[in-house]
Amino acid sequence: MVPAHGGRAAEPVYRPILASRRGELEALGHLDDVVTSLLAPVLQVSILDSYTLDVLGRLPTGLLPAVDVTGLPDAPETELARWGVPLVPVIGLADSDRRLVAHGAAARGHAHRAVVRLRVGQDRAGPDATTAAVERVWRLARLVPEQCDLLLDAGDVCCAADVRLAEPRLRRLLEWARRHAWRSVSVAAGGMPPAVSGLPTDEPVRLDRWDWRLWQRLADLGVGYGDYGVGSAVPGADQPGDRLPTVRYTTDDAWWVYRWSRRGGRGDDRFADLCRALVSAPHWPAAGADFSWGDHEIVRRARRGAGAGSASNWAAWSTSHHLAHVLATLARPGREARPEPWRSGQPAAERGRPARPHRGGETRRAG
């Protein structure tokens, strides 16, 4: 993977929200140690099995994932402190008292911190009610704000209208967030459509990265960046559909989706054809196979050095390139959207005009 930083350890600059599927976990397992300190993945665990626990225990040195078990039953076996692997708990405002206590134990058992995930479309109380909700979290988990990274999750953002709707909500939440001494604050969204099976085949299709555009409009406020990798933020999306070889390839402001049915024969032939088209495209990186583990695997298939693989492999290679691209972009010298560090206690200005205190307490929503 292309190094995304000059070498010294640093706070994470990127919080991808990833499903705990084989493809995404394999991509994390192939990260270079030089970039692990810059990445703080949030893993959404919907099925607890031995494979997931085994992979979590074998992640690269320095990579400490945050784990969200909202999709699992509230039961003793889903208590993160029992898993026996280093991790950071992800806390939701609606978590039960029992789960908050368990998350606090998990936080104290490893990194002494947690991620508080506020879902913009669901947790839409006023600022005072939101403060009461996070104070409940801190009390039951026995944590303080300085131990908590706030993740504002805008969910599905797939068009310009979604960006226009999400931005003012996020700005109000960021204004509220400055009341508290958070360890950090990040904004995440997902711009990938729920399904790509309806896209044209045998040609790369460009899809705008609306999640990235949304964050660029907020980066001046000092917030960190998060997304859903190359997956969708829509619950239940990305389910197995057609079996056509598919690669979702990230560039600065777009994805190029390759779905290949050409040649009509063996899957190895179709995928080799897809990979040859990709490595000859203008958006193929100058570093080529050295850009990421995923790019290396794509080059191998273009040269017919290995078989086509499976849908999990295609997701792994796509995710690997995506993580490398985002990290390289965030660390790029002179990048316009480079954020200043988050500071609490400072008013968040409305875009294009100075900030001023609002009146009316609960009459103005926090999200």
Enumerate the predicted regions with their spans.
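Alpha/beta catalytic barrel-like cores
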Residues: 1-95, 183-184, 194-367
